[in-house]
A protein has these predicted regions:
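Post-signal peptide N-terminal regions of Sec-secreted extracellular proteins
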Residues: 28-134
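N-terminal prepro-regions of secreted/extracellular proteins
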Residues: 1-45
Length: 134
C-alpha cells in the first residue's frame, strides 16, 4: 500500500471515530454513583444529588425557603463549549419546600451541566454562583 493510500485510510478512520455518537457506556464512565450538590441564595437553599442514568444527567432534591420572596432553581448545559439556554426547573414563593427533578440528555466528553438558585422566576439576573453537576 502506498504512503498516500495509508494516509487516506488513517484520515478516514479518524474521521469515522469522531463522527460516532457518545454511548450510554461513555456517560456511565463518569460514574453512576450519586454525588451531592447544594446551592444557597438569600433565604433559599437547593440541595440534592446528581447521577447518570444511561445518557441522561439526573439531578434531584429540594428547594426550600425560610423567608418571603420567590426563588427558582435553574440549570444549564454546555455542549462543545456552547452554552445552551438556562432552564427554570422549580420555583417556590414564600416559606416551604418543593421537589426538584432535572433530567437532561448528556453526551460525553464535550458536555457539562450546572445548577443555581436565583431570585424570582423570570431570569437568571440575580443568582448564586453556578455549581457544576459533572
Amino acid at each position: 500500500m502506498s504512503a498516500r493510500m495509508r494516509t487516506s485510510v488513517a484520515v478516514l478512520a479518524a474521521a469515522g471515530a469522531l463522527a460516532l455518537p457518545a454511548t450510554p457506556a461513555a456517560a456511565e464512565g463518569v460514574g453512576t454513583t450519586a454525588v451531592t450538590w447544594s446551592v444557597s441564595l438569600g433565604t433559599a437553599k437547593a440541595e440534592g444529588t446528581r447521577r447518570f442514568e444511561g445518557t441522561s444527567l439526573v439531578a434531584e432534591g429540594r428547594l426550600s425557603n425560610t423567608g418571603p420572596g420567590c426563588y427558582s432553581v435553574w440549570t444549564q448545559v454546555t455542549h462543545d463549549f456552547v452554552p445552551g439556554p438556562a432552564v427554570r426547573n422549580a420555583t417556590l414563593c414564600g416559606p416551604g419546600a418543593v421537589d426538584v427533578l432535572v433530567r437532561r440528555d448528556y453526551w460525553l466528553p464535550t458536555m457539562t451541566g450546572r445548577i443555581t438558585v436565583c431570585e424570582g422566576s423570570a431570569n437568571t439576573a440575580t443568582c448564586a454562583p453556578w455549581k457544576s453537576l459533572v
